[in-house]
Every structure is written in structure tokens, then in C-alpha cells.
């Protein structure tokens, strides 16, 4: 396990990898802690292995939350079009199935690779809930 890193992420799924991608682009070393043996397991099998990576018809109105403005902020900061642009920049071919669902033409592995391209130093550790591998100290909570 990495003894010192800039960012510790709990969860190696889609959101965790996206956070790791952003941190990597900013030159940060990243440690991802997850229960799965490999990161992105659910991404790898989603959409029959082709990854339903976004829905062009998603909107804040489709989400329920105690804070009804949260989704507005999230959708304003990063839209479906932003993710489609990322996929296009990585030359990943995709198609629309029904109701705005976008899938890779080939494999979900392409999306996983797209997320990890900018992670400069990644350490992935498989942890079960009852294991303790190290003492983690958080210096800054955002």
C-alpha cells in the first residue's frame, strides 16, 4: 500500500474513477480503496459489457433529493455533453439505443481506460469492510 498519497478515494466505481481522473490531471497521487478485487467492476459488466455511460435525457427533474437544488448544481458543472466530449476525445465509438441511452460500440473497458488516462500515480487496494490495512490520517476534508 502506498505510504503517502495526496488523495484517498473510497470506492473504485464510476464516481471514484472520475474523481481519480480529475485528481490525476491536477498532478495528485491517488489511493483508491474498494471492496472489489479490481476497480470499475460494475462499469465492466454494465450494459452487457458495453457500458451505458450516459443518458442524453437526464435532468434534475428526474432525481429525488432532500436538497432539490443539488442536482441542478451537479448538472450545471458537468453535463452529459461534457462526458460525450470526453468519450469523443478518446475516439470511443458509441451509439444511442433507446430513450437517449448511450453505449460503447465495443467494450466497457474503453470507458474505464478513458477514466484512468490522467491518473498519474494510482494505488488500488482491495479491502473488505472488516480489514484494516493502515492508519489513514486525513489532513484536509473538502
Predicted ranges, named:
Residues 50-95:
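Glycine-rich active-site loop/strand segments that organize a redox cofactor
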Residues 7-31:
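N-terminal Rossmann-like FAD-binding beta1-loop-alpha1 element of flavoenzymes
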Residues 72-78, 98-116:
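Short beta-strand to alpha-helix junction loop
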Residues 125-132:
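Conserved small/polar residues in nucleotide/adenosyl-binding loops
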Residues 47-52, 113:
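Short, hinge-like loop/turn segments at secondary-structure boundaries
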Residues 25-44:
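Glycine-rich FAD pyrophosphate-binding loop
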